[in-house]
Amino acid sequence: MKRAIFLFYFCFVLSLVNAQTPKELWTNANNLYSKAQYADALQSYLKIEESGYASESLFYNLGNCYFKLNEIGKSILYYERALKLNPSDEDLLNNLNLAKDFSLDKIEEVPDFILKTWIEDINYSFSSDTWSYFALIFFAAMALLLLNFRFGSSSRLRKISFFLAMASLLLGLLAGYFSLSQRYRYSLKNTAIVMKPVSTVRSSPDDSGKSLFILHEGTKMELLEEIGDWKRIELADGRQGWITSLDIEVI
């Protein structure tokens, strides 16, 4: 019994000694990737994710590894996860579009209201953190302008300072809204990617439901409802149906 306990603690201590920190795993994974050892690099990146870390760079590199290994569904999944953290990254968007070119389903999106599209384009032109910095800058400018309004040497200067302070307030609130909206979007689990080579979308949440259409690996969808192991989905072109949870992975 004592020998068994000793062996247990010996193995436990040995595992702690051999355990790599996330920083060491990151460096090792990057080195492996640069040597085109994509499968080994992938395992190191996954260990970092399993330890609880999440970042745009980590998801981006995971997407790259899966793409190099020709796992298109997983590649798109991780590019989409990275995109939720930084919607303005051009390299990320280019890689995502490249991966989508390898997906069999070519779905035409239903165009949104032009004003909504315009606002979203502005919102996603910067990351959530960048919008937070902008908000702080605008609020700081507002505070300085209000001081100038209070202690300005002339009525004209005070009037200009007041209007500029109000403009800074509005811009600060807008930047704060964009930052919070992106954070809220990241917290949502309402989109998913098909992981199976072929998946059937049915008219009802069971295998006996009528087959409506077929989806292939890498296709993105919005999740509307869940019943048991089935999820009601909507595609970018407006088509809806039920798909088994086993065939998809939430972004």
Residue ranges and their predicted role:
Residues 34, 187, 194-223, 228:
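Beta-loop motif signature
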Residues 108-150:
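Membrane-embedded alpha-helical segments of integral membrane proteins
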Residues 158-181:
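Internal/C-terminal transmembrane anchor helices
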